Amino acid sequence: GQCRIAPLHSCLVADDTMSAIAQRLASLGITLPSVAAPAAAYVPFVRTGNLVFVSGHIAKRDGKPWVGQLGLTMGTEEGQAAARAIAIDLLGTLQAAAGDLAKVRRIVKVMSLVNSTPTFTEQHLVTNGCSQLLVEVFGPEVGSHARSAFGVAQIPLGACVEIELIAEVQ
């Protein structure tokens, strides 16, 4: 089905036929959120040509920043859960940018910042929480992507993880 939305709102399927992506989201029990209002002087995404640059999204739990530092107050599994939660928020923003997730041709790149101690070395495993969900939703040909994962000393609002992405759309 064709997904028509107004910016900053969640997706509403326009007919009885769900797209394969909408079906995957439903089977995973995922409802995409509305685009969150920026916390500073930036926009949630920029579309130029066929590329969409989605601004960094921080991990949230119960609507508040998911605060913590990997290697001190959080372990890898909790970090992965935070990264997966971010992926859901990123998908909501990407849907607003593209008009329909079925228009996504490729997740090009994911960049992850992990609030971690100097001795924590599993940023790549934390980021898998996001990467794996993108592949689950889009399949390996569209969802697999280039990626960077960095350990950083701090993230805005004390969040444990921040992730941004670049996607190619129709």
Describe these PLM feature segments.
Residues T17-Q170:
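Short, polar/acidic, helix-capping and beta-turn segments at strand->helix junctions
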